[in-house]
Amino acid sequence: MDDLMTNIEHYHVSLTTGFLPPSAPLTHLPQKYYEPWETLASSLPTRIRDGSLRHQASLIPLLETDFLVTDAEWQRAYVVLGFLSNAFIFCQYPPSERLPLSLAEPMMNVSCYLGLPCVPTYSGQTLWNHCYISEIQLPVLEQVNTLVSFTGSREESAFFGISVAIEKCGSPLIRTLLHAMAAAEAGNEKELTACLSKAMITIDSITSILPQLYGRCSPSFFYNTLRPFLEGTQDLKSAGLPNGVFFETKNGGSYQKFRGPSNAQSSLFCFIDIALGIEHNDNSFLTEMRQYMPGPHRDFLARVEAIDSVRHFISANPDASQLQEAYEGCVLALARFRQIHIRLVARYIVIPSNGTKTADQSSMGNGLSSEPVSIAGAQGTGGTKPVEFLKVIRNDVLESLQAS
């Protein structure tokens, strides 16, 4: 445990910022060589609106990734290429079956370096794609801005910013829950109780952030305007692309099929579950989502999994009433978060899906198509039925109390 705490930065995790980078993400790649990427990314909302994106993307030269040096540069490249790629594919209906060489080749190379699939993920749209408008230590939603955007809208910034604010607010849980696991390992009941009580307060603070999205990002904007750009390449059969999207490469190319970005790709909540010993009865989707987390984060979670969760110690000490109460409070706080998240998803996905607008009514891409705006219907962008999935996750959280 001491070794893990000492070398935590090796896993691109910070005791201060959690899974967010310790320094602000790059707003621009420093090498002029990559200016074609940056120029198109900066004009992305305009190019999508006027219908010129695919033409402009076809003019970009094939750029090698050899000149990317720092982790921040690789992350910035992944953000830019991820947005450009999904914008190219989904800016019009039907989606493009092919991603041109100038985007596909570097996207595959950058993704491979970062240990990610060649598709936009939670990390690329949230962890590495934000800046703080002001220097207040704990950002609220108004203080988070998106660096690369499909629409250029404050509503889009609010949608992605809510996850940034949650990650920042939840960052103290890294230290708190690692200390809790160390206390359990050492049999220190008093310290473990204190850590769990502290964790409960932090989780409740996270939960209080979720409703801030209401009024800042409308369900109509999210579902009809933003969400089409958050699709993956896996569930496109209904759009006539059963094989996914063909990524052109210098060696020919191949079809790629990956899920879209999902909050299930957040390493923070996976870490919380591991530390508290919350087991999921059907974890196949959550296990798959690990592959959509940055490689170092996956390695960190694997290290934490190798340590006994606090639940083992708590189960072995049923008469420690204060400890049991602290654990119960922590788990119930997490269940409250899951419940509020269910309500949010119902408002932003399920309800709009019952009255889906067509693209000419909702400004998907250039607004010329009459095809349904959402390929996935009431599915989440990760390919699940979101409310059903989240209810199972919430119930798994509550079941951990019965088994403790």
UniProtKB/Swiss-Prot annotation:
Q: Keywords assigned by UniProt?
A: Dioxygenase, Heme, Iron, Metal-binding, Oxidoreductase
Write down how the cofactor binds this protein: Binds 1 heme group per subunit.
Which major enzyme category is it? oxidoreductase
Q: Pfam families per the record?
A: IDO
Which domain of life does the protein's organism represent?
Eukaryota
- An individual GO BP term: L-tryptophan catabolic process to kynurenine
Q: Name one GO cellular component term.
A: cytoplasm
Q: In which pathway does it act?
A: Secondary metabolite biosynthesis
Entry binding sites for heme b: H341
Under Enzyme Commission nomenclature, its number is 1.13.-.-
Which cofactors does this protein require? heme
Q: Which GO terms describe its molecular function?
A: heme binding; indoleamine 2,3-dioxygenase activity; metal ion binding
Per the entry, what this protein does is: 6-hydroxytryptophan 2,3-dioxygenase; part of the fragmented gene cluster that mediates the biosynthesis of fusarochromene, a tryptophan-derived metabolite closely related to a group of mycotoxins including fusarochromanone. Within the pathway, fscD is responsible of the cleavage of the pyrrole ring of 6-hydroxytryptophan. The first step of the pathway is the epimerization of L-tryptophan to D-tryptophan in the presence of the NRPS-like tryptophan epimerase fscC. D-tryptophan is subsequently hydroxylated by the tryptophan 6-hydroxylase fscE to yield 6-hydroxytryptophan.
Family to which this protein belongs: Belongs to the indoleamine 2,3-dioxygenase family.
Q: What is this protein called?
A: 6-hydroxytryptophan 2,3-dioxygenase fscD
Which organism is this protein's natural source?
Fusarium equiseti (Fusarium scirpi)
